[in-house]
């Protein structure tokens, strides 16, 4: 009979060999080469699939910059990890962004699709703040209020119906079982 510590060492060794073989097989079957570590690269390189024409276009920034941490703040959603805003002039390209690889079909579709919302720093044409102050919005405010009241009434009626149903039909927890 084998001693207990020897048996445990044998089991641990067999497990390590099996895990090592499994790891090497999965690495051999993967199609893409492993990414180099941060130390091997020298400095941290940001993973980007494209370059946005405007930093104010948050949807574009979120799509293009793959390693950004987004933090919800009370007034806005702020991207962290982008560094300082660019000090160059805004591009006058008709596209939303430029892809780094033309073979990335998702990126090409996203960057070159029309129409895409224009981002503006100052309230101007088409900005949400302008829409709040137009007379067109004020005329539909009554309709919005009516719809909100309808939604509230429907929710209230549904809740009352559920409460009445619960008090009317007290079901046993074992209603499907027959007593023998």
Curated annotation (Swiss-Prot):
Keywords: Cleavage on pair of basic residues, Disulfide bond, Secreted, Signal, Vasoactive, Vasoconstrictor. One of its GO terms (molecular function) is hormone activity. The keyword Disulfide bond applies. Residues 157-180 are annotated as: Disordered. InterPro entries: Endothelin, Endothelin_toxin_CS, Endothln-like_toxin. Disulfide bonds join 50-64, 52-60. The record marks 70-71 as: Cleavage. GO terms for cellular component: extracellular space. Residues 97-112 are annotated as: Endothelin-like. Residues 27-47, 71-180 form a propeptide. Residues 1-26 form the signal peptide. The keyword Signal applies. One of its GO terms (biological process) is intracellular calcium ion homeostasis. Endothelins are endothelium-derived vasoconstrictor peptides. Belongs to the endothelin/sarafotoxin family. This is Endothelin-2. It comes from Atelerix albiventris (Middle-African hedgehog).
